[in-house]
């Protein structure tokens, strides 16, 4: 789009002032004024011829009184001295506008044409861009490198942690929650509900020495021997500590650090207690399956009101205690101090999946033909799941 040419004019000045215009002015002054006007008209004629020659060199024929051009916008004749050339068409200065927002494009650097219509840059990207960045919401051209996560596409510079703005590259672990991207450290703290907003990524790295948090893939781990208290190797704080007791008369507790950041401040531990119906549900399922999968954990979370993470660690500790009891029985020892025992796993030749004494079974609501092997009592209350919604931890390849 450019301003091209002007109308061709005769070298002589077409303006001739009437004699009455100079009434009352002496003859010498009138002659000087006329000479000055003729000199200016000749200089303007030379400039017009130069612009006309430039128009021919650029491939645009100059406008002439004999064959005036038609405006592609309004369809009228172009009688102005200057006009616009865009998409091989001629336009009045006032007629080149965006067909969507009616923005005048005479002073814009670029304009876009699609199916005979003229668009400004914003409207063209909004309507015809193939994909838009999920972070900055700007269009992504076909030649750009992008990062993909789920169904979203990002510019390379926009694929950063929503909390600390750390750039994520290929091979980095990241998490997504509600279409927001988080680095591994902030996603773990987000899941635990213990993130202090005043700390940035650089401050966390300086205090922790690398942010080498363990990766939890959502499945219970199998340990040999007595389970130990797990700690983060980089942060030096407890992740989760669970009591392994399963007594119905006494509520079990989950010990967890309420605020792992900053390490210099001491805070009281938050204790989460199990209720009797929660213990009964978990123990009855443990009698059937020692290692529940994600689908079973979801069903248990809905029935007990506990999070998947809490259920995972409870089953992990229950498996460890069950193995200790087996070792004691093999060695001929009897655990007299512990008055409770976990139910034994079902034998391979047993035909029933549910233990005796249970009234109903927990079924999968999404597929009625599949029965989840979780046995509950008839007076069990249903609870909503307290686990975070739409959260995943993804490894970017």
Swiss-Prot record:
Residues 267-326 bind DNA. InterPro entries: HD, Homeobox_CS, Homeodomain-like_sf, LIM_Homeobox_TF, Znf_LIM. Residues 248-272, 330-364 are annotated as: Disordered. GO terms for molecular function: DNA-binding transcription factor activity, RNA polymerase II-specific; metal ion binding; RNA polymerase II transcription regulatory region sequence-specific DNA binding. One of its GO terms (biological process) is female gonad development. Residues 69-130, 131-193 form the LIM zinc-binding domain. PROSITE patterns: HOMEOBOX_1 (PS00027), HOMEOBOX_2 (PS50071), LIM_DOMAIN_1 (PS00478), LIM_DOMAIN_2 (PS50023). Its main location: nucleus. Pfam families: Homeodomain, LIM. CDD domains: homeodomain, LIM1_Lhx2, LIM2_Lhx2_Lhx9. Involved in gonadal development. PANTHER family: LIM/HOMEOBOX PROTEIN LHX, LIM_HOMEOBOX PROTEIN LHX9. This is LIM/homeobox protein Lhx9. The gene is LHX9.
């Amino acid at each position: 789009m450019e301003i091209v040419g002007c109308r061709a004019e005769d070298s002589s000045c077409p303006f001739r002032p009437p004699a009455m215009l100079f009434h009352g002015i002496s003859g010498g002054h009138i002659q000087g004024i006329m000479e000055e006007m003729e000199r200016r008209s000749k200089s303007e004629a030379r400039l017009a011829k130069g612009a006309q020659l430039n128009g021919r060199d650029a491939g645009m024929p100059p406008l002439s009184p004999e064959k005036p051009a038609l405006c592609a916008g309004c369809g009228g004749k172009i009688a102005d001295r200057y006009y616009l050339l865009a998409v091989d068409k001629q336009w009045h200065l006032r007629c080149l506008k965006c067909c969507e927002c009616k923005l005048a494009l005479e002073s814009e650097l670029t304009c876009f044409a699609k199916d005979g219509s003229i668009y400004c840059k914003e409207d063209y990207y909004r309507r015809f861009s193939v994909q838009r960045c999920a972070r900055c919401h700007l269009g992504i051209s076909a030649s750009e490198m992008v990062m993909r996560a789920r169904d979203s596409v990002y510019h390379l510079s926009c694929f950063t942690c929503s909390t600390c703005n750390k750039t994520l590259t290929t091979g980095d672990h990241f998490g997504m929650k509600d279409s927001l991207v988080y680095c591994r450290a902030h996603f773990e703290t987000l899941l635990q509900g213990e993130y202090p907003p005043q700390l940035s990524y650089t401050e966390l790295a300086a205090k922790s020495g690398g942010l080498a948090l363990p990766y939890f893939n959502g499945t219970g781990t199998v340990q040999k021997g007595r389970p130990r208290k797990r700690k983060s190797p980089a942060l030096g704080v407890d992740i989760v500590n669970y009591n392994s007791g399963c007594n119905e008369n006494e509520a079990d507790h989950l010990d967890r650090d309420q605020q792992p950041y900053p390490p210099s401040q001491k805070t009281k531990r938050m204790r989460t207690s199990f209720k009797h119906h929660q213990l009964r549900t978990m123990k009855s399922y443990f009698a059937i399956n020692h290692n529940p999968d994600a689908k079973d954990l979801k069903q248990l979370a809905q029935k007990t009101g506990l999070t998947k993470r809490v259920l995972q660690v409870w089953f992990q500790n229950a498996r460890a205690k069950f193995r200790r009891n087996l070792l004691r029985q093999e060695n001929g020892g009897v655990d007299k101090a512990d008055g409770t025992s976990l139910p034994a796993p079902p034998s391979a030749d047993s035909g029933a999946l549910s233990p005796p004494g249970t009234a109903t079974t927990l079924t999968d609501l999404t597929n009625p033909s599949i029965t989840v092997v979780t046995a509950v009592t008839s007076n069990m209350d249903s609870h909503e799941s307290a686990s975070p919604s739409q959260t995943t931890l993804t490894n970017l390849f």
